[in-house]
Structures are given as C-alpha cells and as structure tokens.
Design a protein with these regions (language model features):
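Acidic/histidine-enriched, beta-strand-rich ligand/metal-binding domains
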Residues: 17, 35, 91-92, 126-128
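A short, exposed loop/beta-hairpin motif centered on an aromatic-Gly-Thr core
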Residues: 23-33
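Short, charged, surface-exposed hinge/linker loops at domain edges
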Residues: 2, 44-96, 101-108, 119-123, ...
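Short, proline-centered helix/strand-breaking motifs
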Residues: 20-23, 99
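N-terminal segment of the canonical double-stranded RNA-binding domain
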Residues: 1-14, 18
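A short, charged, amphipathic alpha-helix used as a generic interaction element across diverse proteins
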Residues: 31-48
C-alpha cells in the first residue's frame, strides 16, 4: 500500500511530514531523505494501531486528489510504500489456488509498488472487508 506524504520546510526548522490519508499521523526529519524514512515508520506504527483497534483500513488517495487542498500548497510530495503483511501481526502460511494470469498480474502490480504478493492480498482483503462491513451498534 502506498500512502502519499507532503513535506514542508520552514526556515530554521526540520522537514515536517503530513500523511493526508491518516489523520493524526505526522513525522519530521532533518533532511528530505530522513523525513521520508521517519514517515515510513510513522505510517507503519499508525496502521498497526488501526489494525489493533480493528478499525477499517484507510485507503490512500492519489497525490492529485490531495494536491487540490490549499493546506498542502508548496509542499514536496512523495509516496511511501508500506507492506501490510509485515505489520499485521503474526503471519500464517496458506495455500490458495488462483488462475496463472491473475497471479502474474498480482505479482507485477505488487512489484511495481514495492510490495509483496502477501502484502497485496492482505491489503485487498482488508479493503474489501472495510468496504462491505455491516454497521455495528
């Protein structure tokens, strides 16, 4: 899963990072590279909290979607890849059967986003459950 981040820098300060799709998820770094690295950790921790609280996983929007927001004007945009399979707790090996063409498409899609096959399956499953979850009282 790739989350867009926006990085701002004020004079005499570190780089500040905002994750628009994850309200309350912020980070900072002394350089742009450090800011992005710190954002990866902040996003992973934030998503881990969401998983532990059994809340729906927020689906990231495109940079273009957020670029329209004046709060993010003059920011530097980047995408941060997070492998949900690595943060979703203890993993369990499963055996599934899929059409070869679908498997090939999955692998290519995951590779293009710096994810694993397992991470893609976990992400797709969480998004599907979140989209089809019955409201609870």
């Amino acid at each position: 899963m790739r989350y867009p981040i926006v990085i701002h820098k004020d004079p005499d300060s570190d780089y500040g990072v905002t994750v628009p799709d994850l309200p309350g998820c912020f980070s900072a770094g002394s350089t742009l590279d450090d800011a992005i690295t710190q954002a990866e950790e902040a996003i992973a921790c934030h998503l881990e909290g969401i998983l532990l609280d059994e809340e729906p996983m927020p689906t990231p929007h495109s940079i273009e979607y957020h670029h329209q927001n004046p709060d993010y004007a003059d920011g530097v945009w980047a995408l941060v890849a997070v492998d949900l399979a690595k943060i979703s707790g203890q993993s369990k090996r499963i055996n599934i059967t899929l059409p070869a063409r679908l498997l090939s498409q999955m692998d290519q899609f995951a590779a293009n986003r710096g994810e694993t096959r397992s991470g893609l399956i976990a992400q797709a499953t969480m998004e599907f459950i979140a989209a089809h979850r019955e409201p609870t009282n």
